[in-house]
C-alpha cells in the first residue's frame, strides 16, 4: 500500500493542494497501521499491548474517514466537474462502495478502541488487523480512482486555459 501511495503521489502530487493533503493524511494512516501491526503480545496474560499505538491508529483511522466523507469527496467532485458532471456515474458507483467500506472499518474501530488485548484475544485481534488492512487496501483503490479522475480533469482544464491564452496572444 505504501508503494502504491508513493507511485500515486509521484503521478499526481503537486497538481492540487487538496489532493496533496489527502495523500499526506493517507500516508500518516498507513504509517500508524504499519506500527500497530508490529505489536506483539506480552508474555504475561492480561498485559495490554501498546495501547497508545492502537489508540493512535484508531484516531488516525477516524480522522481519515471523516475528512474523506465530510470534506474531500464532495470538494473534489464540485471543484472538478460540478453537480451536473457526466462523470457523476463514476462517483455514483464509488460512493456506495466507500460507504460500505467505512462501515467495515468503523466496526474494527468500535471493537478495538479502549480494549485490552491479551493472549486469549490476540489471535482474533491479529486477524482483525489483517482484515482492516484488506479493507484499507480496497478503500485506497476506490479513492485512487477519484484522485486519478480529479488529476486528469485538472490537467485538462490547465491545458484548455493554456490554449486559450496562446490563442489570445
UniProtKB/Swiss-Prot annotation:
Entry-linked InterPro entries: Rsd/AlgQ_sf, Sigma70_reg_Rsd, Sigma70_reg_Rsd_AlgQ
Domain of life the protein comes from: Bacteria
The entry's keywords: Cytoplasm, Transcription, Transcription regulation
Pfam families assigned to the protein according to its UniProt record, in alphabetical order: Rsd_AlgQ
GO cellular component: cytoplasm
GO biological process: regulation of DNA-templated transcription
Entry's localization field: Cytoplasm
Primary localization class, coarse: cytoplasm
Cited function: Binds RpoD and negatively regulates RpoD-mediated transcription activation by preventing the interaction between the primary sigma factor RpoD with the catalytic core of the RNA polymerase and with promoter DNA. May be involved in replacement of the RNA polymerase sigma subunit from RpoD to RpoS during the transition from exponential growth to the stationary phase.
Subunit structure: Interacts with RpoD.
Family in the record: Belongs to the Rsd/AlgQ family.
Protein name: Regulator of sigma D
Record lineage: Bacteria, Pseudomonadati, Pseudomonadota, Gammaproteobacteria, Enterobacterales
Originating gene: rsd
Amino acid at each position: 500500500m505504501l508503494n502504491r501511495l508513493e507511485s500515486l503521489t509521484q503521478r499526481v502530487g503537486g497538481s492540487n493542494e487538496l489532493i496533496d493533503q489527502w495523500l499526506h493524511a493517507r500516508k500518516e494512516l498507513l504509517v500508524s497501521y504499519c506500527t500497530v501491526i508490529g505489536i506483539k503480545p506480552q508474555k504475561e496474560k492480561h498485559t495490554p499491548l501498546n495501547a497508545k499505538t492502537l489508540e493512535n491508529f484508531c484516531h488516525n483511522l477516524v480522522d481519515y474517514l471523516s475528512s474523506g466523507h465530510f470534506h474531500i469527496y464532495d470538494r473534489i467532485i464540485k471543484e472538478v466537474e460540478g453537480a451536473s458532471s457526466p462523470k457523476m456515474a463514476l462517483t455514483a458507483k464509488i460512493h456506495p462502495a466507500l460507504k460500505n467500506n467505512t462501515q467495515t472499518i468503523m466496526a474494527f474501530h468500535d471493537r478495538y478502541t479502549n480494549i485490552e488485548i491479551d493472549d486469549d484475544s490476540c489471535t482474533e485481534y491479529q486477524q482483525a488487523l489483517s482484515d482492516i488492512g484488506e479493507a484499507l487496501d480496497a478503500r485506497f483503490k476506490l479513492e485512487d480512482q477519484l484522485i486519478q479522475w480529479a488529476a486528469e480533469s485538472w490537467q485538462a482544464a490547465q491545458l484548455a486555459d493554456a490554449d486559450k491564452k496562446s490563442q489570445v496572444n
